[in-house]
């Protein structure tokens, strides 16, 4: 698989650009702040419908514009697919597949498969559990695009159930049973959607564990062995020896919801469900968070991405590799290890502030990025 074309309109610093891409290695070179990362971000957005830098879509739209458009043409085993995404702040995105509108933007997931390495990856090790949950869900959705609907449904249930919890305590005090009956209905929805989400994550972690272990050994052969484990907020799920059925997870969630009912009513928040779970990262007998050195943290973050790459390759479709300024962050040995893996990929798109950040023995197409002033302010452009 490779991206043959990227077109942007009013995306970040790009007023307009049409880039013809090709298999192999391409390096986008330019000073920081000139817009090279925005190109990689656009491709990642086309693959996942999300940015690796911001949580909302509003910053993706160029200042003064009403919407941004990201267009990609992807080639997979000789077949071309064109994806057009229209991003509008505060409204649902619109999407077209091969120029035909689709009902939901989620229908384009899976057309472009990609793995992104970026400086933000350190948050996978040092950040909050939400960063690690997002990593798992993005990878699971890349492999099974239908899971995007499960995630959306679950998030909606959590929001609505939380709103109900904030009013239910007072209703119960007044003896109003109807609110509690409604809460029980939402418990069923949360357990059903949550069970599907937990099942996908637990299965993914089981498959990912050996790949992360191997990747970490490649990156840091003298360090302690790496391991990952899914940690659930529900005791019955946490104590299960391995992947279980969706029905098992649903029953466990319903039981936990019943037992935590009083605590949830008192606090007005959902205390049970996969939105409170975590991916535990360990080095030897210690958790990586709080105990790993800077170099070990980088190795673990890279191992998670390399593990994702190997897992996607095992599915039969090699993903596009996106490397956003990561070579500049790495020491010589880790840079060499990453370059070895990336060098064999079908397509690698790299950003760098200076050409010297790229491995010397890489034969790569080089694209210079510039910044110019126009009537709308500073805009990025490709040097001719």
Curated annotation (Swiss-Prot):
Keywords: ATP-binding, Cytoplasm, DNA damage, DNA repair, DNA replication, DNA-binding, Nucleotide-binding, SOS response. The RecF protein is involved in DNA metabolism; it is required for DNA replication and normal SOS inducibility. RecF binds preferentially to single-stranded, linear DNA. It also seems to bind ATP. HAMAP family: RecF. Pfam families: SMC_N (PF02463). GO terms for cellular component: cytoplasm. CDD domains: ABC_RecF. This is DNA replication and repair protein RecF. Its main location: cytoplasm. It comes from Mycolicibacterium smegmatis (strain ATCC 700084 / mc(2)155). NCBIfam families: recf. It comes from the Bacteria. One of its GO terms (molecular function) is single-stranded DNA binding. GO terms for biological process: DNA replication; DNA synthesis involved in DNA repair; double-strand break repair; SOS response.
């Amino acid at each position: 698989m490779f991206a043959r074309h990227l077109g942007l309109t009013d995306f970040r610093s790009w007023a307009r650009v049409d880039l013809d891409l090709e298999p192999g290695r391409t390096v986008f070179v330019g000073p920081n702040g000139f817009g090279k990362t925005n190109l990689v971000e656009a491709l990642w957005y086309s693959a996942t419908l999300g940015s690796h830098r911001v949580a909302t879509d509003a910053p993706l739209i160029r200042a003064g514009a009403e919407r941004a458009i990201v267009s990609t043409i992807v080639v997979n085993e000789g077949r071309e697919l064109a994806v057009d995404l229209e991003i509008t702040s505060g409204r649902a995105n619109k999407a077209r597949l091969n120029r035909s509108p689709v009902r939901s933007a989620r229908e384009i997931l899976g057309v472009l498969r990609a793995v992104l390495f970026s400086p933000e990856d350190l948050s996978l090790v040092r950040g909050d559990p939400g960063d690690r949950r997002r990593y798992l869900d993005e990878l699971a959705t890349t492999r099974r695009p239908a899971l995007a609907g499960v995630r959306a449904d679950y998030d909606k249930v959590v929001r609505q159930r939380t709103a109900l919890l904030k009013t239910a305590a007072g209703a119960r005090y007044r003896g109003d049973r109807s609110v509690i009956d409604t809460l029980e209905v939402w418990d069923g929805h949360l357990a059903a959607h949550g069970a599907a989400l937990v099942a996908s994550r637990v299965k993914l972690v089981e498959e990912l564990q050996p790949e992360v272990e191997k990747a970490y050994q490649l990156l840091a052969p003298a360090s302690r062995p790496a391991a990952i484990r899914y940690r659930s907020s529900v005791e019955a799920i946490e104590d299960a020896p391995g992947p279980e059925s969706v029905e098992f997870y649903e029953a466990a969630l319903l039981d936990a919801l019943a037992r935590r009912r009083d605590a949830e009513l008192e606090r007005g928040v959902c205390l049970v469900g996969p939105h409170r779970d975590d991916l535990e990262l360990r080095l030897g007998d210690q958790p990586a968070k709080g105990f790993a050195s800077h170099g070990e943290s980088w190795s673990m973050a890279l191992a998670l991405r390399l593990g994702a790459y190997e897992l996607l390759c095992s599915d039969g479709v090699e993903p596009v590799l996106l490397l956003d300024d990561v070579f500049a962050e790495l020491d010589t040995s880790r840079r060499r290890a990453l370059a070895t893996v990336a060098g064999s990929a079908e397509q690698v798109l790299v950003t760098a502030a200076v050409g010297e950040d790229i491995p010397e023995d890489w034969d790569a197409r080089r694209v210079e990025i510039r910044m110019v002033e126009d009537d709308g302010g500073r805009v990025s452009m490709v040097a001719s």
